[in-house]
């Protein structure tokens, strides 16, 4: 089976779940191609980028300058030479194709692509990518079935939903399969009008063979805490920093590492300085997978206090939590989005309410005193949960079988 991944931007260091699924399909022996609208960050890449030669497998549709007017000029210049093609004219149908017609991105692509991209199935990651893929198929740029994976921001952000809800309803008709990553999102798609027969929950997972289950590590002095996340509001890292302020005031010895990059970096650093926590909180930025693994090995607890952003943006089910649970690192997170579908509070990890720094600090302080037997029981159940329900190899085999039926 030829599988093409349709992405708005590739590669992105924060979207390891996309990278992992691409390499999994390659490992299963499928012919894989990547079609992306824009080139992502090729400077900060994971080892798989080179190992699997993904640059050679990727076709970028646009190489645009920055800035709205510059983009529009670029697209107009690309559109004009292709006006002799019927698809280019068709792409200028504002009524049918909406903003992606008005901003000329569809016509620019149609003008430049002389031969369609052909695959048995196109897997579009995130709802907006599915919307664009369905339009490009109708315009003859893509040829194959389209399955769209819905993750989190694409089905929770108020800004995204205000723009894309009518587009999604078109996608429900044009597309072949909707793949929400959680039961919660499956319910939301149904409530938006997607026919139930076009919905199948397909979770993101982890490759269990990549993780050696470490021996039970009792919390040390200081307590070693770690977060690996894109630095955005919904990750709740500002709540974690506030909890750290309270822990320090209580005399709890700890060290906290926050790994990742993102738009909230300056805000988080300012908060650390404001609370005078520079001696206990470290933000080393982006680290490749092998360095992250070494830092995870040193950690006593993995912290991800996710929240609903002020714009409504929510998590799906964070892969970072799955990875920590798979390797045997205890996790502390929040009752948020699909996280309770992964972490059973008090049994395979610990959950506190969203935006509750006091509850988070209390949970971490209590964790620092946990006994070995209780910790071992939680860690064992956590790994079993991931192995049973979030095993990437099993999930991707099931997905491949499903895709062959559409």
Curated annotation (Swiss-Prot):
Give its E.C. classification number: 2.4.-.-
One MF term in the entry's GO annotations: glycosyltransferase activity
Q: Some GO term, biological process aspect, for this entry: which one? A: slime layer polysaccharide biosynthetic process
The regions listed as transmembrane in this protein's record are none
Q: Tell me one Pfam family matched here.
A: Glyco_transf_4
**Keyword field contains Transferase:** yes
The family database entries (Gene3D superfamilies) matched by this protein are listed as: Glycogen Phosphorylase B
What keywords does the record list, in alphabetical order?
Glycosyltransferase, Lipopolysaccharide biosynthesis, Transferase
Determine the domain of life of the protein's source: Bacteria
This protein's pathway reads: Slime biogenesis; slime polysaccharide biosynthesis
Do you know which InterPro entries this protein is assigned to?
A: Colanic_acid_synth_WcaL, Glyco_trans_1, Glyco_trans_4-like_N
Major enzyme class: transferase
Q: Which family does it belong to?
A: Belongs to the glycosyltransferase group 1 family. Glycosyltransferase 4 subfamily.
NCBIfam families attached here? wcaL (TIGR04005)
Q: This chain belongs to which protein, by name?
A: Putative colanic acid biosynthesis glycosyltransferase WcaL
In the record, what lineage is assigned to the organism producing the protein? Bacteria, Pseudomonadati, Pseudomonadota, Gammaproteobacteria, Enterobacterales
Q: Which gene encodes it?
A: wcaL
